[in-house]
């Protein structure tokens, strides 16, 4: 079970720690529901994923989790186990819209022009209609759709050709960012580990393209990722690269899934002691110490008691 601060009535309060852009703090004060968590279809897998939606701008954020074992947070007068750190970073909403455009093109309308509000519909994830409130939506759609206007109403149809061109630009932008920040992509393609910026000179353009393609592929369906690979004319990776070892970075690449049980990330109860474990010499010496008058660290985080007069 999740452990948290004692609420006074025996109930545990589970809390999460987030890092957010500074301006979101002001937006949350302007509207009571300025920041809301929404469940939307993941553009890569199609599964339900939790996103953060800023109702003021509006703006969409994805959530990543930094996790390490045996870490906890001190929050006010409570200790929060697990030590998870959540990051909310802006995500291009066109990736999520693309999910519905491709789906409509394959299943429902099969190449027909349709109004957007009939394309972005989802009984499983009804909050998807929030995507229609995003600013400059029509300008975004020009990158991935063909457009027609009838009686001052616009109709859209998915365009694979335009989409690949747009994704190609995304790959180039990602490559530029990697080079600017001197990320050693050759090493990351091989082992997904970070190396010093001094080693960047050994990187090849193909490695940058391949790594950038991998990053973009986290936001598109696999079939489209394969099509993008062909569009970029990427050769098949060598056998040693196809199954690289696990990433050393602690920032999870997996999205925060909807209705996820956060307790699975928690470390085991640190109060549990192995029955057959032997005491060290230091532990034996500590056991002999007179502890009368000493306070447990737990006493500093428990509920305050008011003395009766």
From Swiss-Prot:
One of its GO terms (cellular component) is nucleoplasm. The modification N6-acetyllysine is found at residue 295. The modification N-acetylalanine is found at residue 2. Pfam families: RNase_H2-Ydr279, Ydr279_N. Keywords: Acetylation, Nucleus, Phosphoprotein. It is found in: Nucleus. Transmembrane segments: none annotated. Its main location: nucleus. The modification Phosphoserine is found at residue 296. The keyword Manganese does not apply. One of its GO terms (biological process) is negative regulation of gene expression. Belongs to the RNase H2 subunit B family. The RNase H2 complex is a heterotrimer composed of the catalytic subunit RNASEH2A and the non-catalytic subunits RNASEH2B and RNASEH2C. Non catalytic subunit of RNase H2, an endonuclease that specifically degrades the RNA of RNA:DNA hybrids. Participates in DNA replication, possibly by mediating the removal of lagging-strand Okazaki fragment RNA primers during DNA replication. Mediates the excision of single ribonucleotides from DNA:RNA duplexes. This is Ribonuclease H2 subunit B.
